Amino acid sequence: LARVGWVPSGGGLPVANLQPGAAGGSEGVRRTVELRVENLFAGRAGFAPAEQVFLTARVSRNSHLYCYLANASGVMRLLPNETNSQSLVAANHAIRIPDWMSPTPGFILQADRPGIESVTCLATDRPILAELPEVFRGEPIRPIPGIRNVADLLQAHDGLADSNTFTQARAEWRVL
């Protein structure tokens, strides 16, 4: 057996110049985020209220992933959360939102009131939650005070010192 991806016994980090907590191992790959609704099939116009919605996110390189739901109740952080507390995800790995393969997914995503709903996922090279305004560090899966829509969400992230280091994707659907 060989250990793959573990820190060598000699101490240092396995990737040169990698800072602790950084998403390394896929340098040189342009980061993209793919986000899609899995159960909105051809011919369907949208979801009925209370119908479950399932999404999949995928990043092209190792990244810290933060996903937010925007609906009639406001904007809330879906990932990371109490069940999936780590923001670091591997490149090209399907992240299910919610994790419908888990017996305890942490939450169920249901269409709310008629209108447009969306999930926005942001991928970064390093953890950023501690750098965001205090309201973002509150309990996940609860409306974030003062953040009314996706524009407010993105504006808060633009305030980071190196705001050009995040990539985003959004998936929208209509609640009928």
For each predicted feature, which ranges?
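Secretory-pathway glycoprotein ectodomains that are cysteine- and/or Ser/Thr/Pro-rich
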Residues: L1-L176
